[in-house]
Regions:
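Aromatic-lined substrate-binding rim segments of carbohydrate-active enzymes
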Residues: 63, 80-123, 235-254
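Glycoside hydrolase catalytic-domain groove-lining segments
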Residues: 207-332
């Protein structure tokens, strides 16, 4: 009898909660539909999968969906430090290319069909989980993988100071540019952190750059008592910057019209020292055509503040298309509003576009909401 008496009350509570949720959803849709669009801006999505959205959406269906929802560029992750998802003369080819096909050719065909720009995303140094164990073993045996400050092997990370590794990254990017991409896009163009690399090769090459031996290794360059910290930072940033400069020079010479861009960390003051990514220098030198800082924060105010700092550090030679972290936010149903607010912040700062992470199932849900407002094609 008690259960029977409670049932109507519980039912009413559920109905009230459902009605309130539906009202909030309707208000959100109405708010999004009122947001103005901005024709002609660069609207891109990073896609971490080499196969598009996946499931029943191949590259053709994925790019069609992207275009239908107001975006005009895609940055597909088709290459890592030790594997390519396409026919390559530089990198080992992923096993699934034999069964699923050449991802570069598939994505490019879809992009040409629907009028979407294709900037191929290359993860540098990090060989990733799709790289064969045989290639990992080969790199480790040749002394081409990283070692951390405690002497532990980082088998999936290629050492950025090794000349052969630098050449591998350069050749892979140039090959992609010459295959017919609209652009080539650096990612992980940095060290994993300040704790690497301290392999024997790094020591020898650093000593050669200094002109004398370093006896306290790695203590002389790493840690609270490091006496050669400035020289070490210069050495590490030089290894990374050399690749960026060479790729920019060769792509502009060998594949004119193909753009060079990068996904970047977001702190101009600390990034050169911590991860050896001296992106302010790259931008001032004009090596990049556009830069996408990974400004993955939920707050629109914090996002705006970060982007403003980056604008000051970059100067006028390079376009900024800030990275917005849709897939990194709490999935609470309001991500469409949050994304729209950050897009509006980009516009308020006078920038010509933005880049969203990541093109996945969550994006499939959110993009149709944006299409009614901020990415509407008038």
């Amino acid at each position: 009898a008690l259960a029977y008496a409670l049932a109507p009350s519980l039912k009413g509570k559920i109905e009230a909660q459902t009605a309130a949720a539906e009202k909030r959803a309707a208000e959100m849709r109405a708010w999004l539909a009122e947001r103005p669009s901005k024709p002609g801006e660069h609207r891109a999505f990073w896609c971490h999968s080499a196969r598009g959205l996946g499931g029943d959406r191949d590259w053709d269906a994925s790019i069609r969906f992207l275009k239908e929802n107001g975006f005009n560029a895609v940055i597909p992750n088709l290459a890592w430090g030790g594997v390519a998802f396409y026919s390559s003369q530089v990198l080992p080819v992923a096993a699934d290319v034999a069964t699923k096909g050449d991802a570069f050719a598939q994505c490019r065909a879809a992009c040409r069909k629907y009028g979407v720009k294709m900037h191929v995303w290359k993860v540098c140094w990090n060989m990733g989980s799709h790289t064969s164990k045989a290639f990992e073993d080969q790199m480790a045996a040749a002394g081409r993988t990283q070692v951390d400050a405690k002497g532990r092997a980082l088998r999936r990370w290629l050492c950025p100071s090794h000349p052969a590794n630098q050449q591998l990254e350069i050749d892979a990017m140039v090959e992609l540019a010459k295959k017919g991409a609209d652009g080539v896009h650096f990612d992980y163009i940095r060290y994993p952190g300040g704790e690497s690399c301290f392999c024997a090769g790094c020591r020898a090459r650093f000593e050669a750059a200094l002109g004398h031996a370093v006896t306290n290794w790695p203590g002389a360059v790493y840690g609270a008592k490091a006496t050669l910290k400035r020289e070490w930072t210069r050495f590490r940033t030089g290894n990374i910057s050399r690749v960026v400069e060479t790729v920019a020079t060769r792509v502009r010479r060998e594949a004119p019209g193909v753009q060079v861009s990068a996904a970047l960390f977001r702190n101009p003051a600390s990034d050169p020292e911590t991860v050896a990514q001296d992106w302010p220098a790259w931008c001032r030198a004009g090596w990049l055509d556009f830069a996408c800082h990974m400004d993955y924060v939920e707050s629109a105010a914090m996002f705006r503040s970060q982007v403003r700092t980056q604008m000051e550090a970059v100067g006028k030679k390079v376009k900024l298309y800030p990275g917005i972290g849709l897939s990194c936010w709490e999935n609470d149903g309001t991500d469409g509003v949050r994304l729209a607010k950050q897009i509006e912040a980009v516009r308020e700062l006078g920038l010509g576009g933005f880049t969203v992470f990541n093109f996945d199932r969550r994006a499939e849900r959110v993009l149709p909401l944006l299409r009614t407002g901020v990415t509407r094609e008038d």
